[in-house]
Curated annotation (Swiss-Prot):
Keywords: Methylation, Ribonucleoprotein, Ribosomal protein, RNA-binding, rRNA-binding. One of its GO terms (molecular function) is structural constituent of ribosome. It comes from the Bacteria. This is Large ribosomal subunit protein uL11. It comes from Nitratidesulfovibrio vulgaris (strain ATCC 29579 / DSM 644 / CCUG 34227 / NCIMB 8303 / VKM B-1760 / Hildenborough). GO terms for biological process: translation.
C-alpha cells in the first residue's frame, strides 16, 4: 500500500547549502520532519550544483517520512549567471542591464526543458526570451 501524503512543501534553496535555519527549518518543522536528515540528503544530492538556487518539492507522508524532487534552477537565475549580473533591471523597459547571446538562451532553454510546459525547444526559447525581456536583459 502506498504511503498517505500529508503535504507538499515547495522551497527554493541554494544547492549544497541547506541548513535548519529559515526558510527550511520552520517549513519542515511544522510537519514534524527530521530537518537535519533532509538537509544532509539535499546537500548530498545537489553538491555538484553548489551555490545555484534549486527549487525542491518535498512530499510529507503521514508517518513523518519524506521524499523530495529537485527541479532545474529558475530561468531568471540562469540568465543572471549567463549575463554575469548581480540582479535584473528595476525598469526593464527603460534600463537594459546586460546581454546574453542567442546560443546562451538556447542552452538555458535546453536545460530548463524538463520543467517547462513547452512542447519543443523553440517554444522553450521563446519562454526564456520573455523572462530575459522582463528582467531588462538584451538578447543579441
Amino acid at each position: 500500500m502506498a504511503k498517505k501524503e500529508v503535504a507538499k512543501i515547495k522551497l527554493q534553496i541554494p544547492a549544497g547549502a541547506a541548513n535548519p535555519s529559515p526558510p527550511v527549518g520552520p517549513a519542515l518543522g511544522q510537519h514534524g520532519l527530521n530537518i537535519m536528515a533532509f538537509c544532509k540528503e539535499f546537500n548530498a544530492k545537489t553538491m555538484e550544483q553548489k551555490g545555484m538556487i534549486t527549487p525542491v518539492v518535498i512530499t510529507v507522508y503521514a508517518d513523518r517520512s519524506f521524499s523530495f524532487i529537485t527541479k532545474t534552477p529558475p530561468a531568471s537565475v540562469l540568465l543572471i549567471k549567463a549575463a554575469k549580473l548581480e540582479k535584473g533591471s528595476g525598469e526593464p523597459n527603460r534600463n537594459k542591464v546586460g546581454s546574453v547571446t542567442m546560443a546562451q538562451v538556447e542552452e538555458i532553454a535546453a536545460l530548463k526543458m524538463p520543467d517547462l510546459t513547452a512542447k519543443d525547444l523553440e517554444a522553450a526559447k521563446r519562454n526564456i526570451l520573455g523572462t530575459a525581456r522582463s528582467m531588462g536583459i538584451e538578447v543579441k
